[in-house]
Amino acid sequence: MINVETSIIINRPIEEVFAFLTDARNSPQWDSGLVDIQQTPQSPVGVGTRITEVRKFLGRKMETTSEVVEYEPSTKYTRKGGGPFPITGSLTFEPTTEGTRVIWTFKMQPGGFFALAEPLVTRSLRRQLEAGLGDVKDLLESRAGAATS
């Protein structure tokens, strides 16, 4: 079982960060591994919303379909799904004096090639999650700076 957790503080209000990260239509702006994404229904997002992603990971294209199983506005967003293997991804949002702490937890039970290369998969996944959250931070904070200038 692979279990990766990373976090970041984004200097923006929790409602803004939550809304941005839970709308799959925003994902291509910050998720470099994403090839295609479809969300049904497109809005409003909530428990039962389904997301189908095609992504490139470790040189392979994978399609996964997940479903939102937990949706607590400005607090928690969790998706569970499958594809080549079971996955669970959770975003937890906490207010801080600087803005919002986002904690991203990702669990998966790899099979086949990915099971054999579990340490490599774990390192690569951690880098991808950290880079994604860093891109969200840069995007939201620069957008806010542009609005105030």
Model region roles, listed by residue range:
Residues 14-15, 42-45, 69-74, 92-101:
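A short, structured loop/turn motif at beta-sheet edges
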